[in-house]
Amino acid sequence: MAVQTDIEIARAARKKPIQEIGAGLGIPAEALIPYGHDKAKVGQGFIRGLEGRPDGKLILVTAINPTPAGEGKTTTTVGLGDGLNRIGKKAVICIREASLGPNFGMKGGAAGGGRAQVVPMEDMNLHFTGDFHAITAAHNLLAAMIDNHIYWGNALELDARRITWRRVMDMNDRALRDTVVNLGGVANGFPRQTGFDITVASEVMAILCLADDLEDLERRLGRIVVGYRRDKSPVYCRDLKAAGAMAVLLKDAMQPNLVQTIENNPAFVHGGPFANIAHGCNSVIATRTALKLADYVVTEAGFGADLGAEKFFDIKCRLAGLKPSAAVVVATVRALKMNGGVAREDLGREDVAALRRGCANLGRHIANVKGFGVPVVVAINHFTTDTEAEIEAVRAYAAGQGAEAFLCRHWAEGSAGIEDLAQKVVELAEAPSMFAPLYPDDMPLFEKMETVARRIYHAHDVIADHVIRDQLRTWEEAGYGALPVCMAKTQYSFTTDAAIRGAPEGHSIPIREVRLAAGAGFVVAICGEIRTMPGLPSQPAAELIHLDEEGRIEGLF
């Protein structure tokens, strides 16, 4: 019998009406704004009424450094949420929305996989409720208003050479990284160099994911720095009178999306910043809403713990006042073997020696998460090529690092395959949280970057020229010194070289550029060759995506 694909499993799911899913959480039908029969937004009025309720336990799912195909972190997040519900706990899943870029590129969708999926999978991986389109429109409205302001006289005296606000689109398109706009003569404006980022790297995306409510959203939008005058003083979005119109475009997108898993458990899917080039977490408003409605909230942060978990702790939890109770580090035998030097085409063969070498990567992530005061458990996401000897080697290594490891078969078996992990997570979460961020607010910005590089990446030093250091000092003098930092670097390594696997020591982290996200509330350090507009691979997934003769989508994964 052929193994069903993710899309076939999702299509066969017996979904409940979304009002029934909401009712299970105590959300009345009138508080839901339906988008069809199987997804809805939760109204701001209902969310405001939750204030004062006690919070449930917050569980983070993170991972080791991934292989290019991903290691099933979202699948494990969904599976664990289902598993907690299976053992009698009231649990909600909180994950990010999918970007079209990786859907049509290499990584694929963001709805989980196998028997641990959020549905409707096809909608989620494509346009969903239109949030990303609204974010793109709001971002590009500001870009249009900048060029329009300059065209009509430039009363704010913006220096066209120092405009920092680029345009965005939700697609991988390297051809748009660097562009020249306003060509074609004086009727079109004044030519200048700029470029595009992917929507998930937009500061508007980060603002939507970190804002408390609509009032806070508009206030943060107004704080966006769009560029500088010749005297290097900043020009803000509010100076252009753009924040109100942007907030109008984002009004509906600000409301969390409620959907369900294949097992009919509730899931909030809202926001979608990448963790390699942004802060990598779903929205604060969705997480807080879930914490008021459930005893356990299972959320994920993008890529490995060096990126997603660090930003979850140091940016999201710091800014939102959240206290995680436990963390799950997802590992796969194949990724550990790759970290141990095995070529991608050989990952299906047993190689315990390489696996043990690669386990150093797992050990680094376990230690890093523990460094935030959060108890850790390891989930071994099972693949059919795993051997018993390899699985036991991972268990033994994790035990040596003070973390129990559980083999999880949620992809194939759903919640029945992850019960043991769910029980352990409940046990860990019952202890008082000792969570603390990595660095204090009052540490200088460059020292914060050095702290992340040395403590999390085990780098020897951080390389930044005097222009970058001077810029950071200028921002500190302007009152931005207390902001956390967001390190943008490759997800495949603790270094800035994607080819260096394992747990390297003593390397350097070069900072190529720094960007102030004053509205979101952090400073971005772009490290190595990472790009905020990805490109497509030589054989993009888009080549395999099509409609069949009945108009059904094929090829999504």
Swiss-Prot record:
CDD domains named in the record: FTHFS (cd00477)
Residue runs in coiled coils: none
Entry's family note: Belongs to the formate--tetrahydrofolate ligase family.
Pathway it works in: One-carbon metabolism; tetrahydrofolate interconversion
NCBIfam families: PRK13505.1
A GO molecular-function annotation: ATP binding
Pfam family, one: FTHFS
SUPFAM superfamilies: P-loop containing nucleoside triphosphate hydrolases
Protein name as it appears in the record: Formate--tetrahydrofolate ligase
Binding annotation for ATP: T67, P68, A69, G70, E71, G72, K73, T74
Entry-linked InterPro entries: Formate_THF_ligase, Formate_THF_ligase_CS, P-loop_NTPase
Gene3D superfamilies named in the record: Domain 2, N(10)-formyltetrahydrofolate synthetase (3.30.1510.10), Formyltetrahydrofolate synthetase, domain 3 (3.10.410.10), P-loop containing nucleotide triphosphate hydrolases (3.40.50.300)
Annotated source species: Cereibacter sphaeroides (strain KD131 / KCTC 12085)
Annotated catalysed reactions: (6S)-5,6,7,8-tetrahydrofolate + formate + ATP = (6R)-10-formyltetrahydrofolate + ADP + phosphate
Gene: fhs
GO biological process: tetrahydrofolate interconversion
